[in-house]
Amino acid sequence: MDLCRWALGVDYPKRINASGGRYHFKDDWEFYDTLVTNFEYDDALITWEGMCCQGKQYYGRGRGLTVHGTKGTVLLDRGGYQVYDLNDKLLTEVKAERSAATQDLRSIDSMTTAHFQNFVNAIRSGEALHCPIADGQISVTTLLLSNIAWKYNRTLRLDTSNGHIQNDAEAMTMWRREYEKGWEPKL
């Protein structure tokens, strides 16, 4: 989500809708295993597809992102990236120095190592974070809002300045949780 937002120059979407369900496993897990979410902006759209239980790879990748633009397409995952023009001609290809399978969330590769090293360097020496906390928070909140859209099976309309759900008191109850006595965070 960070990279999609960065590529489009957007923050919070104005609308989010999500549909999917628990189709692969029949167990007591409460969340979906298949989900398609649309994040609508004034002049852009991000579509997120989560299909963790099926083996089909898109563009030869297990996970990653694809940005379709007016002049071409970029495919990016932990193995590197490829840039194509509108005629599907490969213009650029860059491979990561050490990549791992992208079919699951357990992969550790050069990108993971670089993220952790940057975080440690920020703590130790004040190095700038590659993804500032405030920016990462927008991405995480946006993805969590897609869970709310899925749970209530409706489109959420958002205040684009802060991500708050507009005109939907029921959905907004999911904005924060009630903590068990003794477990309340103390800041």
Which residues are covered by each model-predicted region?
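Contiguous beta-strand/loop segments that form the cofactor/metal-binding neighborhood of enzyme cores
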Residues: M1-A134, V140-L187
